[in-house]
Amino acid sequence: MRRGRGSSAVAGPTVVAAINGSVKEIRFRGVRKRPWGRFAAEIRDPWKKARVWLGTFDSAEEAARAYDSAARNLRGPKAKTNFPIDSSSPPPPNLRFNQIRNQNQNQVDPFMDHRLFTDHQQQFPIVNRPTSSSMSSTVESFSGPRPTTMKPATTKRYPRTPPVVPEDCHSDCDSSSSVIDDDDDIASSSRRRNPPFQFDLNFPPLDCVDLFNGADDLHCTDLRL
């Protein structure tokens, strides 16, 4: 917005100026007049690319000073403002708040525990603990003796019994223990049960062979499960 120049005077909630005998209202940067007579202040944030609402004020001068304070915070001392920085003028709201906060911090309250604040942390030095392999002994010296640790209760374990293998299930591999005598009879070290059938289920039935009387002449492999 444009800022008018000339001698200004405050008349109620509006700021007017006399130019060539005519009264004209001065317009400040970042200030707009509402239809009901109050003045609104806003500023454009250069980082967010959006307008920031500063509030509504009773006079245009108050709204202009609020804009100046926000402009200095966003753009620094080189910001374009409505009023120059003057020691006689009241400080902006944020500067006034910082001064009041500093004054309150300098006052000592007898009913306040100052150990809870960061300004008094120098009274309580912090001991830096070494981060070496001897950390266990260092921690023990700071925190006192270690509490006795409870050993977990041990449960008795009994040996598992080997699984019982059925007598019908035998292995036909070469590693099975067996003894061959001179009569070509195979005597197994373990007690085996005679197979129920003397024929192989993988071959077709033999009609010309007596399965019961001529068992010695039958040459076939036994199917053992």
Swiss-Prot record:
A motif (EAR-like (transcriptional repression)) lies at residues 199-205. It is found in: Nucleus. Contains a slightly degenerated ERF-associated amphiphilic repression (EAR) motif, which may be involved in the activity of transcriptional repression. Its main location: nucleus. Acts as a transcriptional repressor. Binds to the GCC-box pathogenesis-related promoter element. Involved in the regulation of gene expression by stress factors and by components of stress signal transduction pathways and could also regulate other AtERFs. The keyword Transport does not apply. Keywords: DNA-binding, Ethylene signaling pathway, Nucleus, Plant defense, Repressor, Transcription, Transcription regulation. This is Ethylene-responsive transcription factor 3. It comes from the Eukaryota. InterPro entries: AP2/ERF_dom, AP2/ERF_dom_sf, DNA-bd_dom_sf. Belongs to the AP2/ERF transcription factor family. ERF subfamily. It comes from Arabidopsis thaliana (Mouse-ear cress). GO terms for biological process: defense response; ethylene-activated signaling pathway; negative regulation of ethylene-activated signaling pathway. GO terms for molecular function: DNA-binding transcription factor activity; transcription cis-regulatory region binding. Residues 27-84 bind DNA. Interacts with SAP18. Gene3D superfamilies: AP2/ERF domain. GO terms for cellular component: nucleus. Residues 127-197 are annotated as: Disordered. Residues 132-143 have a biased composition (Low complexity). The keyword Repressor applies. Induction: Induced by jasmonate (JA), ethylene and Alternaria brassicicola (locally and systemically). Moderate induction by wounding or drought stress does not require EIN2, whereas induction by NaCl does. Transcripts accumulate slightly in cycloheximide-treated plants, a protein synthesis inhibitor. Seems to not be influenced by ethylene, exogenous abscisic acid (ABA), cold and heat stress.
